[in-house]
């Protein structure tokens, strides 16, 4: 489970995220959407314990990420939009490294299945610097799954993937949710978010415009349009926010 309460993040004089609160239950997939600069990546990086929050409470699988970061990080995995791999390690050596870091002893069979699932078996002995952008993304996803985390966060996971890769990635995320993981997916591919996610969080200029179920978002931003797409909801929400700000100013 992920619990975020009254979360703020500032960089010097810049407010990146302001008073954000939300929860992601086990088995849920939350779609985190917003324009560039909305605060999405800052939110994910703070929850993952990569950068500290300015204030607020961030709890991952029952552990406060600030007060108890080691315990929290054992339960989570974060896949950034541009995964940093070790150039001279092979794909299999990356899995071996992650298994050692998380003290996973029975990882080899799981690793083989992950490589097979993501079409990486034939490349298992290839070093990272020789991999395409999409393959590097797949390696990062396999590494994220290896220690069977209770919390998973993805920042633009579709980047670099071909259509088959996108399908495999989407199916694997849905499968992880069915197994009980709490998942956040941040993406500009709104149709993919709509396909995967049961709940939605719209960020705009660091503020939460909406948090709730997808059907509630349709009611809020599209009235009686029960068939409104996430793209329509997104533009109704963000453009409406801009109009309100313009009126107030």
Regions flagged by a language model, labelled:
Residues 166-179:
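Helical segment within the ABC ATPase nucleotide-binding domain
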Residues 152-156:
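Catalytic Walker B motif of ABC-type/P-loop ATPase nucleotide-binding domains
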Residues 56-67, 71-72:
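Conserved ABC transporter NBD signature motif
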Residues 96, 100-123:
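Conserved ABC ATPase "signature" region
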Residues 211-212:
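ABC ATPase "signature
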Residues 127-134:
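Conserved ABC ATPase signature
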């Amino acid at each position: 489970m992920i619990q975020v309460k009254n979360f703020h993040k500032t960089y010097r004089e810049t407010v990146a995220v302001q008073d954000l609160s939300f929860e992601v239950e086990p088995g849920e997939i939350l779609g985190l959407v917003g324009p560039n600069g909305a605060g999405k990546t800052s939110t994910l990086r703070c929850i993952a314990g990569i950068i500290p929050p300015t204030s607020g409470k961030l709890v991952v699988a029952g552990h406060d990420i600030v007060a108890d970061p080691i315990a929290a990080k054992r339960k989570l995995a974060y896949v950034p939009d541009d995964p940093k791999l070790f150039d001279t390690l092979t794909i299999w050596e990356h899995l071996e490294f992650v298994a050692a870091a998380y003290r996973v002893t029975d990882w080899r069979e799981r690793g083989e299945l992950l490589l097979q699932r993501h079409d990486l078996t034939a490349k298992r002995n290839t070093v990272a610097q020789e991999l395409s952008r999409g393959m590097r993304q797949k390696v990062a996803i396999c590494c994220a799954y290896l220690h069977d985390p209770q919390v998973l966060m993805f920042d633009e996971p579709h980047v670099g993937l071909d259509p088959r890769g996108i399908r495999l990635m989407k199916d694997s995320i849905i499968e992880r949710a069915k197994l009980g993981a709490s998942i956040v997916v941040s993406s500009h591919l709104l149709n993919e978010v709509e396909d995967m996610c049961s709940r939605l969080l719209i960020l705009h200029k660091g503020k939460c415009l909406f948090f709730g179920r997808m059907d509630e978002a349709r009611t809020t931003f599209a009235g009686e349009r029960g068939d409104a797409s996430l793209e329509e909801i997104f533009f109704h929400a963000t453009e409406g926010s801009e109009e309100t700000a313009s009126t107030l100013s």
